[in-house]
């Protein structure tokens, strides 16, 4: 994604430094509400504002309001770059539909979000109060707590040793 923004800057489109900074940190520069999914991105560039030279090659281009001599822009490659960036936006837009309301993480597939949500709910239910570890099942937590309490409910009839898990009996 950052590379696509760099391509837009190379083409002469102005992108704010804060947006590039967010992309370098691998964060999205915006989060859209469901109603705005197909709308334009407010506060950012608009492709319609970009002008491409009608000549096959332009000898200069403008970057942040300054002319850069010797730069060549082909109309075809500029259109290709824009289409590539727009396809990336479609991917980002699809991913913004599945946002975790608790922590703000983005997921492209609804199933990924569903699995992620379990992390938030299970932390409250299955956390060991002694060491802070989290468990997906309460039965696993109960087994784990025997380590802290020293409880050994399973006894071997042959050697008289005791164990904290039935699976350790052989």
Curated annotation (Swiss-Prot):
- Cellular component, GO, one term: nucleus
Q: Name one GO molecular function term.
A: zinc ion binding
SUPFAM superfamilies, per the entry = beta-beta-alpha zinc fingers
Q: Which residues form the KRAB domain?
A: 1-42
Localisation per UniProt entry: Nucleus
Keywords (alphabetical) are: DNA-binding, Metal-binding, Nucleus, Repeat, Transcription, Transcription regulation, Zinc, Zinc-finger
Q: Name one Pfam family in it.
A: zf-C2H2
Question: Which InterPro entries has this protein been placed in?
Answer: KRAB, Znf_C2H2_sf, Znf_C2H2_type
Organism domain of life: Eukaryota
- Primary location: nucleus
State the family it belongs to.
Belongs to the krueppel C2H2-type zinc-finger protein family.
Q: What does this protein do?
A: May be involved in transcriptional regulation.
For this entry, the protein name equals Putative zinc finger protein 542
**Taxonomic lineage per UniProt?**
Eukaryota, Metazoa, Chordata, Craniata, Vertebrata
Chain's gene name: ZNF542P
